[in-house]
Amino acid sequence: SDPSLAQQPVLQGGPVHQERGFVLHQTEDRAAQDFDGTLAVTDAIRVTTSQDILTAMAKGQGPRRVVVALGYAGWGPGQLEQEMAQNAWLSVPAVPRIIFDTPFEQRWQQSARLLGIDMSTLSSQAGHA
């Protein structure tokens, strides 16, 4: 078994189906291996929901760059599109360096920088000079 797997954090992906696991992984490492229940996020990033990826990881044969989460956040039909149209979300490309290498507490700031935004200059209050 792979001893580094014991150090792999498991994140809360959202409040829906918290018993379901999701593994976000980069395809570059060991790209020839296919897993059941895998969807492409980008050319370089996949999400897998099947148990075979966990078995491969435990044997040291799975992808090396992973994010593991339990649960997900869900939206009703058209809800996310409406929120995007209302600028309720900031959208950035999926950058493997940020997803897999940046410490969790810095990912939001690093992602905002892709848009030229320095999060430390934003305020949660408006209308006060």
Predicted feature residues:
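A short aromatic-anchored loop/beta-hairpin motif
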Residues: 1-68, 73-129
